[in-house]
Protein backbone atom coordinates (compact mmCIF):
# COMPACT_ATOMS: atom_id res chain seq x y z
CA UNK A 1 0.00 0.00 0.00
CA UNK A 2 1.41 3.46 -0.88
CA UNK A 3 2.86 5.47 2.01
CA UNK A 4 0.53 7.95 3.62
CA UNK A 5 -2.69 6.02 2.98
CA UNK A 6 -4.57 4.78 6.04
CA UNK A 7 -4.44 1.05 6.64
CA UNK A 8 -7.09 -1.18 8.16
CA UNK A 9 -6.51 -4.09 10.48
CA UNK A 10 -7.04 -7.21 8.41
CA UNK A 11 -8.86 -10.18 9.88
CA UNK A 12 -5.70 -12.26 9.37
CA UNK A 13 -3.52 -9.72 11.22
CA UNK A 14 -6.00 -9.68 14.07
CA UNK A 15 -6.05 -13.49 14.18
CA UNK A 16 -2.24 -13.56 14.29
CA UNK A 17 -2.29 -11.13 17.25
CA UNK A 18 -4.85 -13.30 19.07
CA UNK A 19 -2.78 -16.45 18.45
CA UNK A 20 0.37 -14.74 19.79
CA UNK A 21 -1.50 -13.46 22.87
CA UNK A 22 -3.01 -16.88 23.48
CA UNK A 23 0.48 -18.43 23.50
CA UNK A 24 1.68 -15.86 26.06
CA UNK A 25 -1.41 -15.34 28.24
CA UNK A 26 -3.86 -18.14 27.47
CA UNK A 27 -4.33 -19.22 31.09
CA UNK A 28 -4.80 -15.65 32.36
CA UNK A 29 -8.02 -14.11 30.95
CA UNK A 30 -7.30 -10.54 32.13
CA UNK A 31 -3.79 -10.50 30.64
CA UNK A 32 -5.07 -12.13 27.45
CA UNK A 33 -7.83 -9.52 27.04
CA UNK A 34 -5.34 -6.70 27.64
CA UNK A 35 -3.01 -8.15 24.99
CA UNK A 36 -5.70 -8.40 22.30
CA UNK A 37 -7.66 -5.26 23.16
CA UNK A 38 -5.89 -3.07 20.60
CA UNK A 39 -6.05 -5.44 17.59
CA UNK A 40 -9.70 -6.33 18.32
CA UNK A 41 -10.58 -2.62 18.64
CA UNK A 42 -8.83 -1.92 15.32
CA UNK A 43 -10.76 -4.73 13.62
CA UNK A 44 -14.05 -3.45 15.05
CA UNK A 45 -13.36 0.00 13.54
CA UNK A 46 -13.80 -1.45 10.05
CA UNK A 47 -17.12 -0.59 8.42
CA UNK A 48 -17.09 -3.52 6.00
CA UNK A 49 -17.03 -6.61 8.23
CA UNK A 50 -20.58 -7.60 7.33
CA UNK A 51 -19.47 -8.13 3.72
CA UNK A 52 -16.19 -9.92 4.48
CA UNK A 53 -17.31 -13.27 5.88
CA UNK A 54 -19.01 -16.43 4.69
CA UNK A 55 -22.33 -17.79 6.03
CA UNK A 56 -22.36 -19.92 9.17
CA UNK A 57 -25.21 -21.77 10.87
CA UNK A 58 -25.68 -19.97 14.18
CA UNK A 59 -26.44 -21.69 17.46
CA UNK A 60 -28.37 -18.82 19.07
CA UNK A 61 -28.91 -16.30 16.26
CA UNK A 62 -30.38 -16.34 12.76
CA UNK A 63 -27.55 -14.44 11.02
CA UNK A 64 -23.93 -15.45 11.55
CA UNK A 65 -20.76 -15.43 9.44
CA UNK A 66 -17.23 -16.76 9.72
CA UNK A 67 -14.71 -13.96 9.34
CA UNK A 68 -11.82 -16.32 10.10
CA UNK A 69 -11.45 -20.06 10.67
CA UNK A 70 -8.26 -22.13 10.77
CA UNK A 71 -9.50 -25.37 12.29
CA UNK A 72 -9.00 -24.12 15.85
CA UNK A 73 -9.48 -20.36 16.04
CA UNK A 74 -12.63 -18.75 14.67
CA UNK A 75 -13.90 -15.19 14.40
CA UNK A 76 -17.70 -15.06 14.12
CA UNK A 77 -19.79 -12.02 13.24
CA UNK A 78 -23.48 -12.17 14.20
CA UNK A 79 -26.58 -9.99 14.38
CA UNK A 80 -29.16 -9.83 17.17
CA UNK A 81 -32.47 -8.03 16.46
CA UNK A 82 -33.50 -5.25 18.83
CA UNK A 83 -34.83 -6.83 22.02
CA UNK A 84 -33.46 -10.19 20.91
CA UNK A 85 -32.21 -12.11 23.91
CA UNK A 86 -29.72 -14.96 23.98
CA UNK A 87 -30.33 -17.05 27.09
CA UNK A 88 -27.35 -17.56 29.43
CA UNK A 89 -25.37 -20.56 28.19
CA UNK A 90 -21.95 -22.17 28.39
CA UNK A 91 -19.50 -23.12 25.64
CA UNK A 92 -16.93 -25.47 27.15
CA UNK A 93 -14.16 -23.21 25.75
CA UNK A 94 -13.12 -19.59 26.24
CA UNK A 95 -14.77 -16.91 24.11
CA UNK A 96 -14.09 -13.25 23.50
CA UNK A 97 -17.38 -11.36 23.09
CA UNK A 98 -17.27 -7.89 21.49
CA UNK A 99 -19.87 -5.46 20.21
CA UNK A 100 -19.42 -4.43 16.56
CA UNK A 101 -22.54 -2.26 16.11
CA UNK A 102 -25.15 -0.91 18.52
CA UNK A 103 -25.40 -1.75 22.21
CA UNK A 104 -25.94 -5.01 24.06
CA UNK A 105 -26.53 -5.85 27.69
CA UNK A 106 -24.00 -8.60 28.38
CA UNK A 107 -23.80 -10.64 31.58
CA UNK A 108 -21.08 -13.12 32.50
CA UNK A 109 -21.80 -15.68 35.21
CA UNK A 110 -19.97 -18.30 37.20
CA UNK A 111 -21.67 -21.32 38.64
CA UNK A 112 -21.67 -21.41 42.46
CA UNK A 113 -23.32 -24.79 43.14
CA UNK A 114 -21.37 -28.06 42.98
CA UNK A 115 -23.17 -29.36 39.86
CA UNK A 116 -24.36 -32.51 41.60
CA UNK A 117 -28.11 -32.02 40.96
CA UNK A 118 -29.25 -32.42 37.35
CA UNK A 119 -31.25 -29.43 36.12
CA UNK A 120 -30.24 -27.25 39.10
CA UNK A 121 -27.69 -24.44 38.85
CA UNK A 122 -27.03 -21.43 41.02
CA UNK A 123 -25.30 -18.62 39.15
CA UNK A 124 -23.54 -15.45 40.29
CA UNK A 125 -23.02 -12.55 37.88
CA UNK A 126 -19.36 -11.54 37.60
CA UNK A 127 -19.76 -8.87 34.90
CA UNK A 128 -23.10 -7.25 34.04
CA UNK A 129 -23.01 -4.18 31.82
CA UNK A 130 -24.23 -2.41 28.73
CA UNK A 131 -21.54 -2.78 26.09
CA UNK A 132 -21.14 -0.38 23.20
CA UNK A 133 -19.46 -0.79 19.83
CA UNK A 134 -15.77 -1.50 20.32
CA UNK A 135 -16.05 -2.96 23.83
CA UNK A 136 -15.07 -6.56 24.60
CA UNK A 137 -15.26 -9.11 27.42
CA UNK A 138 -13.74 -12.54 28.01
CA UNK A 139 -16.00 -15.45 28.90
CA UNK A 140 -13.64 -18.06 30.38
CA UNK A 141 -13.62 -20.60 33.22
CA UNK A 142 -14.58 -20.36 36.00
CA UNK A 143 -16.89 -17.59 34.70
CA UNK A 144 -17.71 -19.33 31.42
CA UNK A 145 -21.44 -18.67 31.16
CA UNK A 146 -22.93 -15.62 29.47
CA UNK A 147 -26.12 -14.19 28.04
CA UNK A 148 -26.91 -11.01 26.15
CA UNK A 149 -29.68 -8.83 24.79
CA UNK A 150 -29.62 -6.34 21.90
CA UNK A 151 -30.66 -2.85 22.97
CA UNK A 152 -30.63 -1.37 19.46
CA UNK A 153 -31.86 -2.47 16.05
CA UNK A 154 -29.04 -3.85 13.92
CA UNK A 155 -26.88 -4.72 16.94
CA UNK A 156 -23.98 -6.92 15.90
CA UNK A 157 -21.34 -8.79 17.81
CA UNK A 158 -18.04 -10.48 17.19
CA UNK A 159 -16.90 -13.59 19.00
CA UNK A 160 -13.46 -15.13 18.94
CA UNK A 161 -13.33 -18.79 19.98
CA UNK A 162 -10.48 -21.27 20.27
CA UNK A 163 -11.46 -24.92 19.96
CA UNK A 164 -14.84 -26.60 19.65
CA UNK A 165 -17.95 -25.76 21.59
CA UNK A 166 -19.06 -28.69 23.70
CA UNK A 167 -21.84 -30.61 21.90
CA UNK A 168 -24.28 -30.62 24.83
CA UNK A 169 -24.54 -27.12 26.22
CA UNK A 170 -26.32 -25.85 29.30
CA UNK A 171 -28.91 -23.10 28.88
CA UNK A 172 -29.62 -21.44 32.21
CA UNK A 173 -32.53 -19.67 33.87
CA UNK A 174 -30.76 -17.73 36.65
CA UNK A 175 -34.03 -16.63 38.31
CA UNK A 176 -35.27 -20.24 38.59
CA UNK A 177 -31.82 -21.69 39.48
CA UNK A 178 -32.24 -24.19 36.66
CA UNK A 179 -30.83 -25.28 33.32
CA UNK A 180 -31.68 -27.48 30.36
CA UNK A 181 -29.23 -29.28 28.08
CA UNK A 182 -29.42 -28.59 24.35
CA UNK A 183 -27.41 -30.04 21.50
CA UNK A 184 -25.36 -27.38 19.67
CA UNK A 185 -26.22 -27.00 15.98
CA UNK A 186 -22.64 -25.97 15.19
CA UNK A 187 -19.57 -26.91 17.24
CA UNK A 188 -17.39 -24.26 15.62
Language-model segments: which ranges?
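Short acidic-glycine-tyrosine-enriched beta hairpin
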Residues: 111-146
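Glycine- and acidic-residue-biased ligand/ion/polar-headgroup-sensing regions
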Residues: 93-110
Amino acid sequence: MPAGLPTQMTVRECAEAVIAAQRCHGAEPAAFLAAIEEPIAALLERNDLRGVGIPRQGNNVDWSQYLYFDGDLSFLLFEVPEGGRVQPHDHGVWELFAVYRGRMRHTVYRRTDDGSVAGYAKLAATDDRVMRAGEAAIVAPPADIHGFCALDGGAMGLTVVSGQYKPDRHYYDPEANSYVVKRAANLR
